Structures are given as C-alpha cells and as structure tokens.
Amino acid sequence: MKYFNELKKAMGWLGTKPETLFMGQAVTYAGTGMTNTLSDIDPNKLIELPVAEDFQLGVSIGHALNGSIPISIFPRWNFLLLATNQLVNHLDKIKSYSHDEFSPKVIIRTAIGSERPLHPQVQHIGDYTEAYKLMLQTVDVIRLDEPDQIFDAYKYAYERNDHRSTILVEYGDYYNEK
C-alpha cells in the first residue's frame, strides 16, 4: 500500500460520485504533486481556478450550497492560509448564522509541503493542522500520516451525514516515500 496510490484511489472513487467536482490550481494542468492523483477523473469534473484562495473557497461553498460536494484543492497549507476568512467566518459558522438553514459540505484537500528532494523554503512547508483544529468548531481536520488512513478518511468525509466539512491534510514528502 503506497501513499500516492491510495490518494489516487480515493480521488478516483470520489470522481465516480455524481455530485462531486474538483477545483483549485493545477487540477487540469500539471503543476503540483496532487495533479497526478486526479488523472482518472472525468475532465468535466475538474475546475481550474486562478491563484485566488479566498475566492476559491467561496466558490466551493457556493457549489456546496447548490447541492454539489466540492473537493477544493489547496496544494499546501501555506496557500490555504489565504482562504482563512472563508473557512473560519463562513464555512465554519454558516450553520449557526443561518439558524440551521444551510450546512454546506466541502471536502478540503491540502498538504504539508514536501522538503525533499528540493526544499522550497519555509513559506511552503507549514503544518497548521493543530492551529486550525483550535479555530474551527464545525469543520474537522484530519492529518493523513499513513497510507492505510487515506481511502477511509476521504470516504468518511464524503459519506458523513452530519453535513460537516472536512480538511484532509496530506504530506507532500510521502507521495514518493511511503
């Protein structure tokens, strides 16, 4: 069981679900290690977005409110930081401030940036998992330490009936190491 293969398997499984769509940077064009995990997805389910993280998560929330289950891809935690407004003030709180009228479910995919074979410097390798667990009340954060966690975690995020959103945190270095 390999880390990358389990990610590809999970993405392939999610891609078979009629209400899922995948959005972010480098989902249709090569550019990150995550791109290759989407190679089995129907191209019509892939939405390439510009580098505008706050906008991306806002669009993801909108799709979820419309009945889709978006898999919103932020290749590194350091990029997801830029969507913190949408994450903390909207996705995490919308059920409360809408008096339970709205409870969108978004699957957020991010990673701790890889350091090997080339170290991209500190602005690309942050791990903010614990900080976001403290900030978020209705969005769960799951760090994927081992290959055998991956498929079940993505399946759980998709199948959960409580309409909670989930952030799944991958390790960029493990794509080739585990």
Task: Tell me what each language-model feature is.
Residues 1-178:
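Thiamine diphosphate
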